[in-house]
């Protein structure tokens, strides 16, 4: 369970979100859309960080967005000697590995010195929200039957996730607990203390597409070199990112085709997914072509300019 904290930063992104929530807007060739039912961005719930102080790196773990890769990578950078002694690998999961790094306070908690150092680099892997939901659904609902009492009923899952988030965002209970499924399904904007400033972060788009994976692996390699990671280790990390698979990876699952089809074609499921993840598509540079036409045409920059007036 994760402790929820309601903290809305004073960034323009947050002002944008409040603007959306408080009004209705028109979209060309579409009916007027009410935003009151949409899940708000920038609600922070116990964000998870990993550090490599020697290289002045902070990584944020976002569930179902290469979180195991993030942990394995940062464990290696935190203490390479221990990583090798523990026989860890980039294919490790929570269930298959004993990682010494996760017992280290300094690994899990960035120091104030590290946070304020102008040379510290923060990075996070981000993933298309609809694809991220499919990964969650296959892993937690289909394979493990952990999604409420829904089983593999996707309509049931999206409705219950939405209702949970709606209650959470409107709660004034500072000690409210966010559940296991909600933690994995939470909008990207709810992670990493993004309300304190997205501009602080290097965001690496990562999914199952080879082109996307190659591009982000190259960007990460550049970051690591800049932060003083030796060349041979950078090459090892780069290779592992391109080839490693974790035990609970779902992008080659036999059930994925049907899950993706339902996300594309079922209006009930799509309706809830838009309500949950619209702000992720407005705030981050995800490809909006997966959205319904009306939502593709929303000009987030225009609304940001109006709020800033």
Where are these regions (language model features)?
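Membrane-interface amphipathic segments in extracytoplasmic regions
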Residues: 2-309
């Amino acid at each position: 369970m994760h402790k929820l904290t309601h903290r809305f930063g004073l960034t323009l992104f947050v002002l944008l979100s409040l603007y959306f929530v408080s009004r209705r807007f028109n979209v060309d060739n579409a009916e007027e859309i009410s935003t009151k039912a949409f899940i708000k961005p920038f609600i922070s719930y116990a964000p998870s960080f990993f550090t490599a102080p020697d290289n002045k790196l902070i990584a944020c773990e976002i569930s179902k967005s290469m979180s195991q890769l993030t942990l394995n990578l940062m464990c290696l950078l935190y203490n390479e000697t221990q990583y090798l002694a523990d026989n860890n690998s980039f294919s490790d999961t929570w269930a298959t590995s004993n990682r010494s790094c996760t017992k280290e306070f300094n690994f899990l908690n960035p120091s104030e010195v590290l946070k304020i150092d102008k040379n510290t680099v923060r990075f996070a892997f981000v993933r298309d929200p609809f694809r991220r939901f499919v990964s969650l659904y296959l892993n937690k609902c289909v394979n493990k039957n952990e999604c409420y009492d829904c089983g593999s009923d996707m309509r049931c899952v999206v409705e219950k996730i939405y209702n949970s988030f709606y209650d959470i965002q409107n709660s004034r209970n500072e000690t409210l607990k966010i559940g296991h499924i909600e933690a994995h399904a939470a909008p990207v904007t709810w992670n990493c203390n993004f309300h304190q400033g997205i501009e602080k972060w290097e965001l690496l788009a990562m999914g199952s597409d080879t082109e996307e994976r190659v591009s982000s692996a190259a960007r990460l390699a550049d970051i690591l070199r800049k932060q003083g990671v030796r060349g041979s280790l950078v090459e090892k990390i780069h290779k592992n990112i391109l080839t490693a698979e974790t035990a609970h990876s779902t992008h080659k699952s036999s059930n994925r085709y049907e899950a993706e089809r339902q996300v594309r074609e079922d209006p009930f499921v799509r309706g809830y997914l838009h309500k949950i993840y619209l702000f992720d598509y407005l705030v981050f540079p995800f490809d909006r072509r997966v959205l319904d036409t009306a939502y593709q045409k929303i000009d987030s920059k225009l609304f940001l300019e109006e709020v800033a007036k």
